């Protein structure tokens, strides 16, 4: 900070400068000038643009554009004398170097710019367009000056400014950032970080994607391969289930998307759980429609707009960012179909007994029904409307009661009166009592009027109970 103050004081321009450190949680855009890293990989002469040659706002724009391009994997520099920096399938080195970069190096970008630049851009951009800048970077108007600019971070005619080591390091930083940004398994988090700028936790900067959706459509016209990425941004939701001793990730997507999830899942598992996982043990298979029907949890997703308030520069700026939150609906028809196939109810949802379980003890019967109900409840607790969840609980509860009554050759009503509230306790468990994967809560910033996140638990459904005992 002392260097920053000295740098601003020595600046030959007496006009006011603006510094906008844009904070996420573990990522930060901050300042830098021509020093460090063998000559600052982010430096380029900007005299041709008409302002301070130490400022590099255009380079900032190129950097951000580059971050959202298609190439998410680390690649090596075109140097035959150098070994590959990180191989495509070498997950160990990918994990090691990405963590080293994120922990040791900070992505530093110099973003001071002059008032005359701001005023000139304000004349170019109409007020109506300013209102539509929903990107996380909308506080930088110059980032929207050329929406169709799809060039690399450094043009070919200036690539010689960087040494080979710096080019390799820069690509390292860029790919590490993109990999962490796009493929963190946020659906495992109990609570999203406050500075993710998304209430659903699907992406760190999902508002940027939706704010730029028209821009992506323009790219689709010129480059057909971008269509899949555009669809991927619109439907990024992933499902997790444990099925017959295996962990299954379910998503609608292309084979390339599944390979990216596989790559990051290996790194995520090894880093957070300190457990070595062999990539070849993760298989990519296509589930048939009947498999989805049997699992019975292919949920519907609504995207509702909401406002997130960002706190920046120690209360100096309060910015309301429009984001789109997931609101999941319980697929009650699919669940009833699965329960009917497993002989817990009729196709119309009327509870029936489970004759095959009548040979078990009362405790085992109640435990099996209760375990199924609790696991389904944990999965469906992410929905804001729980009427369908209560219906599923009703079916399982009365199916359990009918099974016990059939075992004891008694009427269901009489059996429920004799059992009392003990049966109810097995089917209603508070969410706080569920053992789930909990990440540390971010406490650096807080949002005005923030509420508890609706979450998806790691232990979602044990469909084994619907299979092995049917």
Curated annotation (Swiss-Prot):
Major site of localization recorded for this protein: plastid
Mitochondrion listed as a keyword: no
One example of a Gene Ontology biological process annotation: tRNA processing
Places the protein is found: Plastid, Chloroplast
GO cellular component: chloroplast
A molecular function GO annotation: RNA binding
Protein keywords: Chloroplast, mRNA processing, Plastid, RNA-binding, tRNA processing
Keyword tRNA processing found: yes
Family: Belongs to the intron maturase 2 family. MatK subfamily.
Function recorded in the entry: Usually encoded in the trnK tRNA gene intron. Probably assists in splicing its own and other chloroplast group II introns.
Protein name in UniProt: Maturase K
Organism, as annotated: Nypa fruticans (Nypa palm)
